[in-house]
């Protein structure tokens, strides 16, 4: 309440009673002032939710920090006393840190900071569009460069007046060349085989004639020697025996060689004429 200055008369100051009118005016003024100064109807104003949440979050953080300090001190003591429980304590510390992080995230979400972290959907779409444009630009440039290179190559071909051989044409030409070389080699082998067969047949025929002549000579020599001749003449010297053995060995070797060579030629796939020649030689 405020003190209201009042004007008093001289009689009041001297101790005499003031007049009644003066008292009435003073009382009226005081009542009006009291009415003016009286407070308006009081409404209880509750604190905002944000203020309460911030206070609660600060208190929870302080409690968490205090708990962490206590836990760290207890863990140090436990490590000094029981070093075997290190693994369990480390696991517990990791869980405490994870819980602390989750609680902090929840508090920031409650306080309303989540709108700063989470961008709007429109901004996300704009960012994606910008990224797509950035990625599409180099692709378009590469396609344009490829088209330009192809156009330059076509112009060069037209100007030169010929077409560059492709990989398929090169492969076909190589294959044709290999086939020609292979055919030529086969023809050469066939010619060589024919010549070799003819030479071998001639050699064998010459050897057979030589063997027949040698046999006739031996028979003539045997007929000239009479049975009444001396034992010395009838006895065969040891030098003559190996010569006879050598001649027979030569004939056998030649015949076996002919058989093996002709059989080998037949196995290679020669003509029917060669087979007939071989059969005729076998019957001789």
From Swiss-Prot:
GO molecular function, one term: actin filament binding
Record GO cellular component, one term: internode region of axon
Compositionally biased residues, Low complexity: 225-235
UniProtKB keywords: Actin-binding, Cytoplasm, Cytoskeleton, Phosphoprotein
Region of interest (Binds actin), residue spans: 265-284
Region Disordered: start-end pairs: 1-23, 110-251
Modification Phosphoserine, positions: 73, 214, 226, 230, 233
Subcellular location, record wording: Cytoplasm, Cytoskeleton
Modified residues annotated as Phosphothreonine in this record: 237
UniProt KW Manganese keyword: no
Record-level GO BP terms: actin filament organization; morphogenesis of a branching structure; regulation of cell projection organization; regulation of cell shape
Bias-annotated ranges (Acidic residues): 184-200
Residue ranges the record marks as coiled coil: none
Tissue-level expression: Highly expressed in adult and fetal brain. Expressed at intermediate levels in the lung and liver.
Main subcellular localisation: cytoplasm
The keyword tRNA processing is annotated on this UniProt entry: no
Disulfide bond positions: none
Top-level division of the source organism's lineage: Eukaryota
Basic and acidic residues bias spans: 126-140, 171-183, 201-220
Subunit structure: Binds actin.
Function: Plays a role in cytoskeletal rearrangements during the late wrapping and/or compaction phases of myelinogenesis as well as in maintenance and stability of myelin sheath in the adult. May play an important role in late-stage oligodendroglia maturation, myelin/Ranvier node formation during CNS development, and in the maintenance and plasticity of related structures in the mature CNS.
Name of the featured protein: Ermin
Organism: Homo sapiens (Human)
Gene: ERMN
């Amino acid at each position: 309440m405020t003190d209201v200055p009042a004007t008093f008369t001289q009689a009041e100051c001297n101790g005499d009673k003031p007049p009644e009118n003066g008292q009435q005016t003073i009382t009226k003024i005081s009542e009006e002032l009291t009415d003016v100064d009286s407070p308006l109807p009081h409404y209880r104003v509750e604190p905002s939710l944000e203020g309460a949440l911030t206070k609660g979050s600060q208190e929870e953080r302080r409690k968490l920090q205090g708990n962490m300090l206590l836990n760290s001190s207890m863990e140090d003591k436990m490590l000094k006393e029981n070093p075997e429980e290190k693994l369990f304590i480390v696991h517990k510390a990791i869980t405490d840190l994870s819980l602390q992080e989750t609680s902090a995230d929840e508090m920031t979400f409650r306080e309303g900071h989540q709108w700063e972290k989470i961008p709007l959907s429109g901004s996300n779409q704009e960012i994606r569009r910008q990224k797509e444009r950035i990625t599409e630009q180099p692709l378009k440039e590469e396609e344009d460069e490829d088209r330009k290179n192809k156009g330059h190559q076509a112009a060069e071909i037209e100007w030169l007046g010929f077409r560059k051989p492709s990989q398929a044409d090169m492969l076909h030409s190589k294959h044709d060349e290999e086939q020609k070389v292979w055919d030529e080699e086969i023809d050469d082998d066939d010619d060589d085989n024919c010549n070799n067969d003819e030479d071998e047949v001639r050699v064998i025929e010459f050897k057979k004639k030589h063997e027949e002549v040698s046999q006739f000579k031996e028979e003539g020599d045997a007929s000239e020697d009479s049975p009444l001749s001396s034992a010395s003449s009838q006895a065969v010297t040891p030098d003559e025996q190996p010569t006879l053995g050598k001649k027979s060995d030569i004939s056998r070797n030649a015949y076996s060689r002919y058989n093996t060579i002709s059989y080998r030629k037949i196995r290679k796939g020669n003509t029917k004429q060669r087979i007939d020649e071989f059969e005729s030689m076998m019957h001789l």
